[in-house]
Amino acid sequence: MSTFDKHDLSGIVGKHLVYTYDNGWNYELYIKNASTIDYRIHSGMVGNRWVKNQHVYVVRLAQDVYKVSWTEPTGTDVSLAANLADKIFHGTIFFPRWVMNNPEKTVCFQNDHLEEMAKFREAGPAYPTEVIDEFATLTVIRDVGENNESVIDCPPDQLPANFPENLKN
């Protein structure tokens, strides 16, 4: 009988992850608790976007392997898999057509623009959906504890010039 506990999220909750997709996009994710994340997008189509208190679903797939999934107010769906032991990350992002057509509309601190994001989403168009399916390399994995509001507390362009190297000290 297996002793694997698929409900044990202690290996991912409280982790701050920085990763670079194979396409060059840089992201940052903080697993704030078992149902909430904060994140920053450093580069790529929606670079300089950041979000706090995004509701998510977190599951444990295997030892040191977790999946985090959510739907954003923009209508974008995201599913991420993190293999912490091998520092391998995989993300699938389902962008509605309106985001692909006008990504700059989402480049903001989303929490201050929730009504606006909902209006954009409702106006659409939603289809055809653009699927971004990419592997990434985890460059920083650090334990910062649960519900730490200081982990992601400013836009990417206000971080130290040596980010994320400054985290490795």
What are these regions (language model features)?
Residues 23-27, 49-54, 74-80, 88-90:
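Short, surface-exposed coil-to-beta transition loops
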Residues 23, 31-36, 62, 85:
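Residue-level recognition of beta-strand termini and adjacent short loop/turns
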Residues 69-169:
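Beta-sheet ligand-binding and adhesion/scaffold domains
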